[in-house]
Structure formats: C-alpha cells, structure tokens
C-alpha cells in the first residue's frame, strides 16, 4: 500500500469551496455526505442534472440557464447540456473590471508586464470592436501563432466575445505543423508576435508568416503584437494601433451554451491532426468545477501554470479569470540560466497554485534541487499533469519543495479540455496516486470485454455517462466517423479515453500511460510509466 504523504486539516477542509458546495447540497436535497468524497461523487454522477444545475448557480455563471439541464440522447455524444442555455464566454472572464491585477507575464529574460482587470476589460472590448469592423462574424475562425503573452489572452477574449472561434499553436511548432492544423479550419485572421525567446535565443515569428500566408489562402489579415514591448518594422496590422484607433464595444451578445469557443488538435501522430471543437459553456462549467471545487481556487488567488499556447492547460489557466483569480504567465524555457526560474517566479509573486508538467518535477528531482530556501508560504496547491507523476516524484515534492501542500496529480486531455482524474480537498495524498475521479464524470476501469475491473486490476479508462466538456464536434466530420472512431470504437456508447489505468483501494487512480503505448511482453501489459521510472 502506498504511504500517506499529506492529509488536509479539519480547518482546511471546512474552509474549502467543496465543503461549502456540499453543505448547500446537503441542505437542499436533505442528504448527508459528511466529508466522504466518494459519497459526494456518487451523488454527482447518479443525480447529474441536479449536480450540474447546482454548479451553474454556485459558480455564478452569467447568462441564461434555461429550465432544461440535460437533454438526453441514445447516442452518447449527442446528449446536450443546458440546451436552452446562453452565455457570453468573455463576459464571464472579465466581469471583475476593477483596478486590481488580473494578469502578470514574465519571459525567460526576466521582463515583466502586468494588466489590471479594468484595462483587460477595456482592451478586450476594443479588440472585439476591431474584429466587427473588419467583418468578423460568429463562427469565423481566428488562428493564433503566439507565445504565452497578455496580448494572446486579450485577442482570445475579443474573439470569444464576438462568437468567433479561436485556435492557437505555440511558436515552437514549425511552419508545416502550423499549416497542417490551421489550413483545415480556414481562418480569416492570423494573430502573431514579432518574436519570442527560448533558451536564450531570440527567434523571429515575422520571418515565418509569408510562408504560412502562401499555404493558407483563407487568411485575409495579420495582426502582430510586440513581444516585450520591442517594436519591429513589418507590413501587418499593429495590435497597439488597434487599441488606439478603435472604439469600446460593450455589447456582450449571448450565444448558445454549446457555441464553439475554440478548436484544439490531436497530436497528429497518424495523418493530419484532428480538429477538436469545444463549446463555450461546456468548457467553462467544467473548468470552473475543476478550479473551484477540486483545486480550491478562490477570488484573488494567484494561479500559475507552466504551459504553451499549444497545450490545453493554457485554456485551463485562462479559465482562472472566471474564478476572479489573478493568473500568471511564463514564456520561455523553465530552466534558462538556472533551474529555479519558476520557483523564483512563485516566490516573487506568492502563487497560491503552482502548476507544472510531471516531467518538470522529475527533472528537479534528477538535479536534486532543494526549494526549502525559498519563501513559498502562500502556496496551497501544486498540480502536475502531462504524464503520470511517479511515486518517487511525489515523495520528492514533500521532501524538497514544500511539506504542507496539496499535491494534485491530474489527468484529462485535449479531448475534454479538462480533467477526468483529479485532486480534491477532502482526501489524503498517497504516493503515486491521483486522488479521485472528477465530480460529475462517471469514471470506471474496464477490461477488454467491457466489464468493470476489480480494485487493483489494470484496465481501460472509460466514462459511462455523457458529460459537458465532450467535444461538440470534430471539424470537417460530417459523417461523424472521426469522433466515433476516436472515443466509441472499443466499447459501444461508452467513452473510451485511451489511458491504461488502475483504481486503488484508497479511492484513487494510478495511470500507467496511454493504452496504445503499452507493451505486452509474454502477454502482460506494461505501461510507459513503469518502463521509464
């Protein structure tokens, strides 16, 4: 049995958002969960209409909820959540509109930039005005080849505000990788920066744009923002000029709950990457649930995730604004000059949540990095994702980074633009284990024949009931062959996620890697995380 590394105090449990949420449920539905997470999770999947309705209210989502919560369909992915609901995604993220800090950006060079909530609101409204002026309408696609900067978020929010569809690639994608993705969705506008830094090198993005335009004829306009405020002469539309020359557009039209908000991409290991389309309300309610109930993010918290704009954790981080938390961006190498870049950033700004990839923690462990000398007094939560966090790395975090911290190993993916197996504020942390299934997500582990495995047996991660953040569609998939092949080929009308996983006796999970990456020596399946320990 894996050892307990950390347990929340009674005070911490009672001060959590999840405790407040479950107390409201107990009173309203005359039920008692105590602080038994599994009981609460069971209720959330067995009474999922009540659960998702209560989430909308508890998170104070702005929009029209509608009376119908779930419109069921015999076909799993055709089930609709809040079918009469309407929201404006951007409005839910920028409504704080005061003079406190909303976003901080730091590049690997140490350059920092900040924006307050009221300026974020204003610039979003001006950029949306520009989009309308040049004829951008709902469902038009905006492509962004961008570093992880404040301007990236402003252009995303402006896009969402007018009902257009956002899609981003990070600068480390080569030209062909960008074209393989964006060509499929026929964007009207390309947003980019003049350059970016990585590992001490200044890399031009302007040099790559002519080739991209040659290969994607649908792009009619290019908008360029200045990285680190340094101007570079170019023939494209200046982001700074847009802000100076356009009016404030404070009209927040509400769109259907499942109106497309962004397009993400599968890895593209075989053929062209698949274009995964996510709905605005679907993504918002799922991400707010994860941040507020599972990661205990509160108003004025300081939320950081090390991510690029080509990874779904960027979308997840941006949703922190909907929780009225400040978010912190980092662009560049996490190990440039020193291995303490990110820890120092955490200390300088006193992050409350510090999110990284499992491989980052593994690298710190390998280098025997000791973070004890840093002042991380406000750090409540560390989250790790991207690959399984092995037992030894759990132990390292508690020994060398912080003893009293909630270490949340989390796992989900681009397909759900969220998290399936996740942390929670009620349970203890066991070395090597993800704490729990996500609320409202009917997680199970199946064998090859579609039967639930026993505790301790490895199998396939599945979801047995529809959930909000399923893709609303795949782009260019009129026959639905792509979406059906991606998730429903193995088990009939059951979401097959493609992770090789085991449920533990502690109520948690251990993920061993992707199902299609497991090896079978002598007929025994071995996951990638077991090979690379």
Which residues make up each language-model segment?
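Conserved pre-ATP/AMP-binding loop-to-beta segment of ANL
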Residues: 99-101, 223-224, 234-238, 242-265, ...
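AMP-dependent adenylate-forming
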Residues: 27-31, 90-116, 226-232
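Structural core segment of the AMP-binding/adenylate-forming
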Residues: 161-241, 350, 357-358
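Conserved AMP-binding/adenylate-forming core of the ANL superfamily
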Residues: 38-43, 103-157, 174-179, 234-241, ...
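Conserved ATP/PPi-binding loop(s) of AMP-dependent carboxylate-activating enzymes
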Residues: 437-438, 451-488, 526-527
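Conserved AMP-binding/adenylation subdomain of ANL enzymes
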Residues: 284-302, 311-352, 367-369
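AMP-binding/adenylate-forming catalytic core of the ANL superfamily
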Residues: 144, 169-194, 209, 347, ...
């Amino acid at each position: 049995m894996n050892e307990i590394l950390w347990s929340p105090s009674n005070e911490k449990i009672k001060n959590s958002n999840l405790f407040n949420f479950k107390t409201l449920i107990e009173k309203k539905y005359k039920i008692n969960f105590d602080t038994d997470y599994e009981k609460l999770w069971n209720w959330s999947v067995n009474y999922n209409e009540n659960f998702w309705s209560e989430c909308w209210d508890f998170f104070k989502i702005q929009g029209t909820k509608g009376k119908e919560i779930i419109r069921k369909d015999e076909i799993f992915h055709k089930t609709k959540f809040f079918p009469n609901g309407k929201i404006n995604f951007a409005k839910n993220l920028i409504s704080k509109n005061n003079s406190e800090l909303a976003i901080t950006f730091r590049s690997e060079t140490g350059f920092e930039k900040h924006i307050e909530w009221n300026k974020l609101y204003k610039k979003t409204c001006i950029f949306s005005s520009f989009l309308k002026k040049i004829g951008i309408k709902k469902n038009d696609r905006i492509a962004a080849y961008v570093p992880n900067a404040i301007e990236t978020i402003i252009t995303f929010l402006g896009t969402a505000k007018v009902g257009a569809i956002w899609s981003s690639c990070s600068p480390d994608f080569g030209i062909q990788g960008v074209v393989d993705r964006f060509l499929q969705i026929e964007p009207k506008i390309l947003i980019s920066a003049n350059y970016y830094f990585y590992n001490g090198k200044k890399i031009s993005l302007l040099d790559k744009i002519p080739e991209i335009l040659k290969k994607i004829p649908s792009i009619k306009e290019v908008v360029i923002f200045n990285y680190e405020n340094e101007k570079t002469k170019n023939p494209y539309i200046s982001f700074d000029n847009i802000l100076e020359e356009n009016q404030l557009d404070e009209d927040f039209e509400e769109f259907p709950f499942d109106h497309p908000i962004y397009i993400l991409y599968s890895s593209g290991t075989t053929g062209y990457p698949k274009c995964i389309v996510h709905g605005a309300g679907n993504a918002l309610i799922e991400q707010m649930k994860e941040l507020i109930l599972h990661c205990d993010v509160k108003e004025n918290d300081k939320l950081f995730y090390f991510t690029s704009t080509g990874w779904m954790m960027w979308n997840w981080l941006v949703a922190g604004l909907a929780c009225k938390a400040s978010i912190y961006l980092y662009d560049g190498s996490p190990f440039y000059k020193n291995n303490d870049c990110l820890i120092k950033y955490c200390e300088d700004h006193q992050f409350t949540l510090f999110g990284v990839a499992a491989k980052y923690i593994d690298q710190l462990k390998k280098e025997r990095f000791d973070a004890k000398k840093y002042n991380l007094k406000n750090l409540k939560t560390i989250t790790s994702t991207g690959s399984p966090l092995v037992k030894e790395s759990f132990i390292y975090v508690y020994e060398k980074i912080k003893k009293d911290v909630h270490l949340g190993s989390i796992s989900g993916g681009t397909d759900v633009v969220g998290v399936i197996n996740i942390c929670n504020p009620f349970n203890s942390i066991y070395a090597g284990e993800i704490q729990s299934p996500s609320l409202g997500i009917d997680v199970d582990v199946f064998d090859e024949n579609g039967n639930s495995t026993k505790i301790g047996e490895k199998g396939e991660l599945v979801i047995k009931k529809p959930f909000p953040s399923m893709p609303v569609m795949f782009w260019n998939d009129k026959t639905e062959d792509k979406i059906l092949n991606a998730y429903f080929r193995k088990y009939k009308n059951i979401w097959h996620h493609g992770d090789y996983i085991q449920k533990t006796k502690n109520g948690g999970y251990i993920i061993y890697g992707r199902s299609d990456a497991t090896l079978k020596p002598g007929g025994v399946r071995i996951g990638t995380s077991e090979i690379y320990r």
